[in-house]
Amino acid sequence: MLYGTPVYAQAGIGGMSEIMTAFEEYCVPLFTDLPAAQLTLLGDQLASGFAAGHADMRFEPGSDVVVFGAGPVGLGAVQAARVTGAGQVIVVDPIKYRRDFSMKLGATTTLDPNAEGDGIVERIRELCRGPNDRRFAGGTSWGRAANAVISRGADFVVEAAGIQSMPPKVEPQPDPTNVKTVLQAWDCTRAGGHTMLMGFTLQPVPFPGASLALFGRTIHPGQQGGLHVMRDIPRYVKLIEKGKIDATSVITKKYTLDESRQAVQDTADRTIITGVIEFA
């Protein structure tokens, strides 16, 4: 209590506090020689994105995966798709250096939402279409009727863009509220496919009632990608040790504790992918 007002710690532990209480259930025992900087990414960020394709919504070998947002969370999902053996991994992000970086981690195609405009959903559907319109001839739909449209799209879509709370110093999002991106992620998911919403939007999202009811798509909640910390984090440590997960190159800048304010500013400016504050 502070002057009679209840005070709650951020995320239940108070990660931005000078003093915090680490409850036992928040502690995960790890036995590794990996650098602390890499292990910090397993508290959220990289681990949450990777879990998007391996915990709740599980990517499948040969599947079509789309990731909206190439920040640390989205790049975790890209790596999950690569490790799974996805057929193609399409990354959507307005920032060029992030699109280019995603190609190094497993993306096969990148799209600029500002350049694609309202045609981005159809562009993704075409990329996921297959060689023809006949399923028994290697295509992805039963014919040219309405089913042919809703059957085209990605098997798995991860929305990890989030809102743009401050004007960045790089290319801006087409919709700072992220509502449009959430709807695009839903629309480019094929009938029977899976969508995970990991980014935040503070506005109502008007999902079409017919597609919710009839197309058999599944929406997965994006709370840390379904990460089970006691089960998954030790597994991800092993994957980092084996070189399956890249937890090195995604750290694009390190800061001292005195540079914490600059770290937050750089994150808001989106001039870095992942920043790590190191204690001396």
What is the role of each PLM region?
Residues A191-M196, F207-S249:
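Rossmann-fold dehydrogenase core element
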Residues P94-I95, T201, G225:
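Residues in the short beta-alpha loop(s) of Rossmann-like NAD(P)-binding domains
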Residues A145-N147, Q173, L183, D187, ...:
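C-terminal hydrophobic helical "lid"/dimerization subdomain
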Residues V66, I90, H194-M196, H220, ...:
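Structural detector of well-ordered beta-strand residues that form the stable sheet scaffold
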Residues M1-C27:
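Glycine-rich phosphate/adenylate-binding loop and adjacent beta-alpha elements
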Residues D56-P61, R82-T84, D100, K104-T218:
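Glycine-rich cofactor phosphate-binding loops and adjacent beta1-alpha1 units
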Residues E25-Y26, F31-E122:
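Mid-domain Rossmann-like dinucleotide-binding core that forms the NAD(H)/NADP(H) cofactor-binding site
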